[in-house]
């Protein structure tokens, strides 16, 4: 096994165990608002600390970028670990059992390893660039649909930037003319993994951060899917908007999404 993948899996499982254990102890969860509609808990921080400790033991010089602590610069900035210690914090706080740990390893700007762990279902999604994607020991391939007919799409709402909600509804109104239904699960990392696993046929969202999608992005691509931003480009880790699906489905999604974009995103 790729040695960095091994460490990423170990870190994700350790963090997942902390999250799952505390999910059952609701009175011990301390929630703080770090921005409008944006929450962090003591469990996010405990999960993050566990991940950082495991990475630093094996790779003390690597840079670590996390949702809660920002960038922890190492002497080797070519290797960056991009971490969301609890993707789906709102679900966790509300007692909805759908959240994950997301860890990506980027080397010289290219994602080489992706790990997403769902501690409630004990599902471990992994990918190594050029080696495919897996769910536990099962190889993943995207559902190779030819068009949007009958498709189920995952999405998220721009709850931190409400001015883009009309755009979101325009996109959904356009897509629903072809697709069967939508799902809004509250974990971008798992939405991407579900595209890779064929559980949903595509995913689109505005308002994501790099740590939300860096691991899931590689998992989709290694499962044979395509990931772009709303302009069909590859700047989604910085742009904050993302589309993922099998090739033909993605093309049709973009054809529906692009005419609906807000003026400042065109």
Task: Indicate where each model-derived feature is located.
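N-terminal subdomain of lithium-sensitive/metallo-dependent phosphomonoesterases centered on the IMPase/IPPase/PAP
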Residues: 1-86, 248, 259, 263-266
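Oxyanion/phosphate-interacting regions
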Residues: 1-10, 170-177, 190-266
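Residue-level detector of anion-binding/catalytic polar loops
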Residues: 18, 61-63, 181, 201, ...
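Residue-level signal for inorganic ion chemistry
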Residues: 19, 44, 55, 89, ...
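Conserved beta-strand termini and adjacent loop/short-helix elements that scaffold enzyme active sites
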Residues: 34, 67, 185-187, 230
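Short, Asp-centered acidic motifs that coordinate Mg2+ and/or phosphate
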Residues: 63, 113, 152, 201-202
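Glycine-rich active-site/cofactor-binding loop and its immediate structural neighborhood
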Residues: 77-121
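Acidic beta-strand-loop-alpha-helix segment within the catalytic core
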Residues: 104-192, 239-266
């Amino acid at each position: 096994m790729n040695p960095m993948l091994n460490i990423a899996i170990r870190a994700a499982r350790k963090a997942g165990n902390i999250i799952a254990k505390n999910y059952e102890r609701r009175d011990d969860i301390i929630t703080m608002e770090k921005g409008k509609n944006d929450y962090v808990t003591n469990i996010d921080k405990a999960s993050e600390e566990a991940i950082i400790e495991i990475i630093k033991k094996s790779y003390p010089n690597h840079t670590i970028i996390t949702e809660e602590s920002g960038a922890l610069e190492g002497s080797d900035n070519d290797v960056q670990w991009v971490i969301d210690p609890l993707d789906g914090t709102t679900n966790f706080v509300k007692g909805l059992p759908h959240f994950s740990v997301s860890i990506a390893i980027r080397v010289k700007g290219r994602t080489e390893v992706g790990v997403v762990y769902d501690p409630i279902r004990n599902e471990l999604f992994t990918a190594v660039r050029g080696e495919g994607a897996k769910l536990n020991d099962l190889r993943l391939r995207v559902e190779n649909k030819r068009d949007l007919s009958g498709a189920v799409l995952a999405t998220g709402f721009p709850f931190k930037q409400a001015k883009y909600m009309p755009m979101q509804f325009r996109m959904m109104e356009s897509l629903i003319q072809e697709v069967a239904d939508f799902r809004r699960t509250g974990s971008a990392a798992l939405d991407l993994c579900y595209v890779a696993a064929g559980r949903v046929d595509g995913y689109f969202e505005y308002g994501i951060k790099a740590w939300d999608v860096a691991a899931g992005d590689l998992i989709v691509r290694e499962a044979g899917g395509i990931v772009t931003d709303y302009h069909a480009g590859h700047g989604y880790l910085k742009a904050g908007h993302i589309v993922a699906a099998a090739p033909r489905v993605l093309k049709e999604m973009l054809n529906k999404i692009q005419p609906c974009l807000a003026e400042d995103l065109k």
